């Protein structure tokens, strides 16, 4: 980056839960997709981790927004402000004036034309000059290290915060895909509802997220790897008195059952639409899991048992899409599947 390099290249995984930015092959920003705005002036107060700390704790003059819902932009203005704020965090100090941005952004494979347009417009408003889009399962496959241009079939299941993307990839294209709006956020919401219904305790989105991370599981039998019970503090729903409730992984596994079944059904439906030759490749290679949802205890085992095809968790599931987007950024001229 010299004083006169006029183009800065950044790759962005614009996620419902987290936004990750890569520049020069390194992750430079990895922050929650949250922005805090002043209600009176609509000016940005905080973005990322700082805004997340304010989430669910604000007074009437501040609103915290998660601009993406179900993997797509729900609040256009907030999304643009958030992208601007996060791009600012990327080191641009050593320029005399702000460079023009070349960007590659990951988008859900089930996006409509309107949704793709919204991402592109947001990026352009946030300073992007040259904006390319890549479908997330394709980016995840590249990030995992799969040769996506090879004439063989690979299946990716990317479980993010807002959507689960399932795609069969061959010869640099998506052969069959299925994108459902059941993902990490729904698991968190299932836990919130369960705690309220079963234990009469009110828990915040963040507390439900902690429960999911500490004792979340896809199976009710974990054997020796079972996590210890997690103690939840919160107000009684009826009396508002403080409560202390221990939660075990078995009950969490039960309450996540419905959402996980939806993901299983979506995977089976994508396999049904896969041509037989590619299906044979997938059985041979196994199916790759990426995204934060891949970290749910024993999810890979449950899916392997249910579908009879081995499931492999990506090496760094949280950053697979971002890494793949970073590789795409270096190969903008070569990868014909990038959308302009």
Where are these regions (language model features)?
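Nucleotide/phosphate-binding catalytic cleft detector across ATP-hydrolyzing
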Residues: 1-159, 167-287, 294-340
């Amino acid at each position: 980056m010299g004083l006169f390099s006029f183009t800065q290249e950044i790759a962005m995984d614009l996620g419902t839960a987290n936004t990750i930015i890569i520049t020069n092959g390194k992750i430079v920003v990895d922050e929650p997709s949250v922005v805090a705005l002043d209600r009176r002036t609509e000016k940005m107060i905080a973005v990322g981790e700082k805004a997340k700390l304010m989430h669910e704790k604000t007074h009437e003059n501040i609103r915290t927004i998660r601009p993406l819902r179900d993997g797509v932009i729900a609040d256009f203005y907030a999304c643009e402000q958030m992208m601007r704020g996060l791009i600012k965090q990327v080191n641009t100090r050593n320029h005399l004036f702000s460079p023009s941005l070349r960007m590659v952004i990951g988008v859900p494979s089930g996006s409509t034309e309107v949704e793709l347009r919204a991402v592109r417009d947001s990026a352009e408003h946030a300073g992007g000059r040259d904006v390319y889009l890549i479908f997330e399962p394709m980016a995840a496959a590249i990030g995992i290290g799969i040769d996506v241009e090879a004439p063989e079939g690979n299946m990716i299941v990317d479980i993010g915060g807002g959507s689960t993307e399932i795609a069969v990839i061959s010869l640099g294209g998506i052969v069959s895909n299925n994108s459902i709006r059941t993902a990490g956020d729904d698991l968190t919401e299932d836990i919130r509802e369960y705690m309220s219904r079963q234990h009469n305790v009110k828990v915040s989105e963040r507390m439900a997220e902690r429960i999911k991370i500490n004792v979340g599981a896809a199976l009710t039998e974990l054997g020796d790897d079972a996590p210890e019970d997690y103690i939840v503090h919160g107000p009684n729903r009826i009396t508002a008195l403080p409560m202390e409730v221990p939660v075990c992984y078995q009950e969490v596994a039960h309450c996540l059952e419905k959402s996980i079944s939806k993901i299983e059904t979506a995977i089976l439906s994508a396999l049904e639409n896969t041509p037989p030759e590619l299906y044979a490749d997938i059985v041979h290679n196994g199916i790759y899991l990426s995204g934060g949802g891949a970290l749910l205890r024993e999810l890979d085992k449950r899916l392997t048992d249910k579908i009879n095809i081995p499931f492999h968790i990506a090496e760094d599931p949280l950053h697979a899409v971002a890494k793949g987007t970073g590789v795409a950024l270096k190969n903008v001229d070569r990868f014909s599947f990038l959308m302009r």
